[in-house]
Amino acid sequence: SILISFPVQLNWHRDQAGSWGGLDLTNNLANWTPWEEDVWEPDVRAENCDSSLNRTYAISSSLVSFYIPVAIMIVTYTRIYRIAQVQIRRISSLERAAEHAQSCRSSAACAPDTSLRASIKKETKVLKTLSVIMGVFVCCWLPFFIL
């Protein structure tokens, strides 16, 4: 925040020549590597850039960073969906039982179960939500790992 508030006052770090002494030394050391044959000669190999990818690396990288996580997500979201489905059915059956008992007390004829549709609606909503999450993830990342 100080750098943003007082950007003009940073000139005092410069020496007389106007260069950043410590920064120049750091940049020169970072660009020099001891295994280069001649530091000051232009690199001729830059024109012949090898863009081939090691097959083993490509497969293992794709597996570790995409396919295995997708498999884990599918298994996890399937389990979440099944647990949610069981919970929704339990709650719906309790709601139906309470509604049924209340309707039988208030009138002579008992009303039919109507919350079964609501239960199915809740299940499909959970399924749609999980499908959208998985679908967006796969659609965004699959082209990168196929190409």
Swiss-Prot record:
Entry superkingdom: Eukaryota
Family indicated by similarity: Belongs to the G-protein coupled receptor 1 family.
GO molecular function, one term: G protein-coupled receptor activity
Species lineage: Eukaryota, Metazoa, Chordata, Craniata, Vertebrata
The entry's keywords: Cell membrane, G-protein coupled receptor, Glycoprotein, Membrane, Receptor, Transducer, Transmembrane, Transmembrane helix
Main location: membrane
Listed transmembrane segments: 1-12, 56-78, 129-147
Topological relation to the membrane, as annotated: Multi-pass membrane protein
InterPro entries: GPCR_Rhodpsn (IPR000276), GPCR_Rhodpsn_7TM (IPR017452)
GO CC annotations on file: presynaptic membrane
Name recorded for this polypeptide: D(1B) dopamine receptor
Extracellular side: 13-55
UniProt function note: Dopamine receptor whose activity is mediated by G proteins which activate adenylyl cyclase.
Residues the record marks as carrying a glycan: N54
Cytoplasmic domain ranges by topology: 79-128
Localization per Swiss-Prot or TrEMBL: Cell membrane
